[in-house]
């Protein structure tokens, strides 16, 4: 593997559309380079007002990033300020990661609840 390959940061989302729970995430797969910014989107199940974001690094369990309820942040995991999120009036949510690092390569999961 050449050193140029180590500069890529791979971000993946679960599924290729609606997942079994009815949550929709986009984009489904994303490749960025270090230093770039990424925005991940989540549409919750209809009627759900709470959205939570998780990061799952290969070989590890999911780690909590954020929870929003009715557009207010209700919880934040131990992640740097490069990670931010927000929730919109329709209860959809965005997760933003700035200045990507190789360690940000992971599966990013969104869950919704009442």
From Swiss-Prot:
Ig-like domain mapped to chain residues: 22-114
Subcellular location: Cell membrane
Keyword vocabulary terms for this entry: Adaptive immunity, Cell membrane, Disulfide bond, Glycoprotein, Immunity, Immunoglobulin domain, Membrane, Receptor, Signal, T cell receptor
Gene Ontology BP term (one): adaptive immune response
Cystine crosslinks: 42-110
Superkingdom per UniProt: Eukaryota
Signal peptide span: 1-21
Main location group: membrane
Gene Ontology CC: one annotated term: T cell receptor complex
PROSITE patterns documented for this protein: IG_LIKE
Glycosylation sites: 90
Subunit structure, as described in the record: Alpha-beta TR is a heterodimer composed of an alpha and beta chain; disulfide-linked. The alpha-beta TR is associated with the transmembrane signaling CD3 coreceptor proteins to form the TR-CD3 (TcR or TCR). The assembly of alpha-beta TR heterodimers with CD3 occurs in the endoplasmic reticulum where a single alpha-beta TR heterodimer associates with one CD3D-CD3E heterodimer, one CD3G-CD3E heterodimer and one CD247 homodimer forming a stable octameric structure. CD3D-CD3E and CD3G-CD3E heterodimers preferentially associate with TR alpha and TR beta chains, respectively.
PANTHER family membership: T CELL RECEPTOR BETA VARIABLE 5-5-RELATED, T-CELL RECEPTOR BETA CHAIN
Name assigned to this protein: T cell receptor beta variable 5-5
Organism for this UniProt entry: Homo sapiens (Human)
Lineage, opening ranks: Eukaryota, Metazoa, Chordata, Craniata, Vertebrata
């Amino acid at each position: 593997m050449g050193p140029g390959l180590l500069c890529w940061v791979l971000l993946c989302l679960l599924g290729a559309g609606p997942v079994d729970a009815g949550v929709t995430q986009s984009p489904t797969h994303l490749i960025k380079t270090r230093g770039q910014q990424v925005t991940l989107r989540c549409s919750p199940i209809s009627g759900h007002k709470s959205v939570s974001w998780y990061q799952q690094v290969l070989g590890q369990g999911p780690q909590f990033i954020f929870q929003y309820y009715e557009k207010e942040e209700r919880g934040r995991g131990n992640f740097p300020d490069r990670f931010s999120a927000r929730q919109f009036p329709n209860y959809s949510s965005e997760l933003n990661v700035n200045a990507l690092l190789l360690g940000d390569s992971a599966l990013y999961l969104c869950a919704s609840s009442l």
